[in-house]
Design a protein with these regions (language model features):
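Alpha/beta-hydrolase-fold enzymes
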Residues: 18-55, 180, 197-309, 436-537
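Alpha/beta-hydrolase-fold serine-hydrolase catalytic core, especially in secreted/extracellular enzymes
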Residues: 20-32, 151, 316-322, 328-342, ...
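Catalytic-loop region of hydrolases
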Residues: 30-106
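Short, surface-exposed "cap/lid" segments of acyl-processing enzymes
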Residues: 71-73, 79-154
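Conserved acidic catalytic loop of the alpha/beta-hydrolase fold
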Residues: 157, 166-184
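Gly/Ala-rich beta-loop-alpha elbow adjacent to hydrolase catalytic centers
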Residues: 188-193, 197
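Short beta-strand/loop motif that positions the catalytic acidic residue
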Residues: 346-348, 352
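Small-residue-enriched hydrophobic alpha-helices in membranes
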Residues: 594-752
Length: 752
């Protein structure tokens, strides 16, 4: 009996506790009313403030347009050359960036930087949008910095070729301003500015220094099945004729706002909800960042019809750049990317749905079928992949600027002297116990790992899907010819400056800005109400249940729009492949089974083979001759050949040693680069003969001992020397008639 009573009491106690918890969890009617009133006031105030932010956006848009839409740079600048005054005028200009207060003094002997921003509908400035940006990082390291920007309206006769000629003139101007610089200017091409930088470097290879292509599409057909739907757009629209139609409707001018609209349609959840809801939900902190970005995003620029036709026909749909099919108007110059003599650095991200890694990198297998072919052409290609950042984040993210951009810029001299080949840049956090930490500048360690062409191709799912784009190219050419012959004359006859201006004014990308601005008389009460709201602002607590419900509703809307996007993109891909992978359409446009676009690596001519033969003959004379630097560099390359990794620590240690000994004043970076290339080829051509020739380069015993000791010390900066590398050092010591490195190090320790 007593046991049952105890059980009854315990169960009653548990039930009472549970009921008290429930009563505590359920808010009282008074609390519910308080939360509702508090949330209602806050939601109304946020709505008013959001409308006022949109009004400010409209005013900023109008003010920016009235001022001529200058670059939205965070830095002061001065224009030093105007492309509109050139013999072949272009609406481009070259500006010198004025270092802000607190920045290190610019060193005229350091290599100058030239940033080329994309002309893809928006205005210039994204490359220097913040202090933590490509320009900001360059200025912090003391480099002279220049910016290539453009004006809102193109010159009447402007073409892509005239733009390239203007950029070549800018490059000459920078070189003349820095005659004592340690090497050629470093070119940074952002997004569409990347292919412009490639064309510039291929057209004037003797003038251009290293290139950084940031989020730049070069191989436009590449991608992964189930992703990257933007590449299907040209096919579903029937090719390039629509760009010509838009140019004809614009009275010979293409409106860049159309490109902005296309970008926004790619991500409907952000365009129609997330972007504005983020401002609404964080109305007390977010408007300044939002308005700063919208100033650039809403600055729409124009192109000539001929420029947009060239871009769509040669790049987006034609994909002719990596095929070596781009030629000048007079037919005298062919743009071959293999002509580029300086290192090419590619920065791409897996989170970028506008320029996925395949489109940023597949031009490499388009040009070369093996890394040996890259080496034979004396090219150095480096790529770096981010795991998650989006397209715009590549240019505006402070985290990316402080990590990838800062490390790639800091390692630029090392990249410039890398042996020809293909490398992946791997950037990692340093650890306190990292060997050689004193030779790492900053938080991150960068190393360059040798890669093969197969590693690039492994980033995608094969290239079979690209055959459909061959069909698109043929269909586009047919439709373009039909449009030019039968439709374009009628559209041009119906267009005039007034209709073109009206069409631009009524573009949705512009209407949403000027319609909610002080031009609208209804904006005045919005401003007055918003001023009162700011005075009596009553923000609710984030713990308010209705705020949490609002967030849940927002997430549900985002999921719904993302679901629509996934369905739309899947339907687009299915429709594209249904049309363009059909055998009958391929046959109809003249493509045979298995035919692919001809690539430059399949068209090796007798001239190219003869060039390679003469290069080998030239190298033959260098096995037994050279300077002390040649001998030391050959020793280093021979000993580290099997590692396939180049670390920044040995290079930084070598630079420090050169500064301490005064050799940095005698050996220029360009000299070091040429010696590294030459000795790399000699070791690759005949390793044993290169080793046997070392005694003739390092004649004196003191030079031999010093070169071997320095090479061994440099190798030790990354930690314990690998057995395979130690064996090579011992082999070198034997050839040079010296004691093995390990024994000499032991003897030195004992004597100390």
């Amino acid at each position: 009996m007593s046991r049952s009573v105890v059980c009854f009491v315990r169960s009653s106690s548990n039930r009472s506790c549970s009921m008290s918890d429930v009563n505590h969890a359920v808010p009282s009617p008074v609390q519910c009313a308080h939360d509702a009133i508090e949330y209602g006031i806050d939601a109304w105030q946020r709505s008013v403030l959001l409308l006022d932010v949109l009004r400010e956006r409209g005013n900023i848009y109008l003010d920016h347009a009235r001022s001529g839409q200058p670059p939205v740079l965070a830095f002061e600048y001065e224009v030093i050359m105007d492309g509109r005054a050139l013999p072949q005028p272009a609406n481009y200009a070259l500006a010198r960036i004025v270092p802000p207060d607190g920045s290190p003094e610019t060193d005229p002997k350091k290599r100058p930087f030239i940033v080329i921003d994309p002309r893809a509908g928006h205005g210039p400035g994204i490359g220097g949008f913040k202090m933590d940006s490509e320009i900001g990082i360059a200025l912090k390291q003391g480099h002279p910095c220049y910016f290539v920007f453009f004006f809102p309206h193109p010159e009447p006769s402007q073409t892509i070729e005239s733009v390239t000629r203007a950029e070549i003139a800018f490059l000459e101007c920078v070189a003349q301003r820095h005659p004592d610089a340690e090497d050629k200017p470093f070119l940074i091409g952002n997004c569409q500015g990347g292919w412009a930088a490639l064309i510039l470097a291929a057209a004037a290879p003797e003038m251009a220094g290293p290139l950084l292509l940031a989020g730049s599409p070069v191989s436009y057909w590449a991608g992964v099945a189930g992703k990257n739907p933007m590449r299907y757009t040209g096919g579903l629209l029937g090719g390039t004729w629509l760009a010509s139609f838009a140019g004809d409707c614009g009275n010979g001018t293409f409106d860049g706002a159309n490109l902005v609209n296309n970008f926004e349609q790619m991500n409907p959840s952000n365009t129609y909800w997330t972007k504005l809801y983020n401002v609404y939900a964080n109305i007390d902190t977010e408007p300044a960042r939002f308005l700063e970005f919208e100033r650039w995003w809403g600055g729409h620029f124009l192109m000539n019809k001929e420029e947009m036709e060239w871009i769509t026909q040669n790049l987006f749909v034609g994909n002719r750049l990596s095929a070596g099919e781009v030629v000048s108007a007079d037919g005298r110059t062919r743009i071959d990317l293999r002509n580029i003599r300086s290192p090419i650095v590619v920065f791409a991200s897996w989170g970028d749905n506008i320029t996925p890694p395949q489109q940023a990198l597949y031009w490499i297998p388009d040009l070369y079928d093996s890394v040996d072919a890259i080496r034979c052409n004396e090219q150095t290609i480096v790529y770096c992949l981010n795991d998650r950042i989006g397209h715009l984040g590549i240019f505006v993210s402070a985290g990316v600027a402080k990590k990838e951009h800062a490390e790639l810029i800091s390692a630029l001299d090392l990249i410039d002297v890398l042996p020809p080949g293909l490398y992946e840049a791997v950037i990692e956090d340093t650890q306190p116990d990292l060997p050689g930490l004193e030779f790492v500048a900053g938080r991150y360690l960068i190393r360059f790992e040798a890669r093969e062409i197969s590693d690039i191709l492994a980033l995608g799912d094969g290239r079979e899907g690209e055959r459909a784009f061959e069909v698109v190219k043929r269909v586009a050419e047919i439709n373009q010819g039909a449009y030019d012959k039968f439709v374009s004359p009628w559209v041009r006859a119906a267009s005039n400056p007034w209709t073109a201006a009206w069409a631009r004014l009524m573009n949705p990308a512009r209407v949403e800005r000027w319609a909610i601005s002080n031009l609208n008389p209804w904006a005045l009460p919005v401003k007055l109400t918003a001023d009162a709201v700011r005075t009596w602002r009553q923000a609710t607590s984030p713990e308010n249940p209705l705020v949490k419900s609002e967030n849940q509703v927002s997430r549900a809307i985002v999921r719904g729009l993302e679901g629509y996007q996934a369905w739309r993109d899947g339907a687009v891909e299915i429709l594209f492949r249904t049309i363009y992978e059909s055998p009958w359409l391929a046959s109809l446009v003249g493509l045979k089974e298995g035919s692919v676009q001809r690539r430059t690596n399949e068209t090796a001519s007798w001239f190219e083979e003869e060039f390679k033969r003469l290069k080998r003959l030239e190298l033959e004379t260098w096995f037994e001759k050279g300077t002390l630097l040649d001998g030391a560099m050959r020793l280093i390359i021979y000993c580290g050949r099997d590692l396939r990794v180049v670390d920044e620590r040995p290079f930084n240690a070598m630079r420090e040693l050169m500064r301490e000994s005064g050799l940095d004043a005698q050996i220029r970076l360009s000299d070091l680069k040429q010696v590294t290339k030459r000795q790399t080829f000699l070791v690759l051509l005949d390793e044993e003969r290169a080793l046997a020739g070392l005694p003739k380069l390092l004649v004196r015993e003191s030079d031999r001992r010093r070169a071997l000791d320095v090479a061994y010390a440099l190798a030790a900066t990354v930690g314990e020397i690998a057995p395979v590398e130690r064996a090579r050092f011992d082999r070198v010591a034997e050839v040079l008639d010296l004691a093995p490195c390990a024994r000499r190090a032991t003897e030195a320790t004992e004597s100390a």
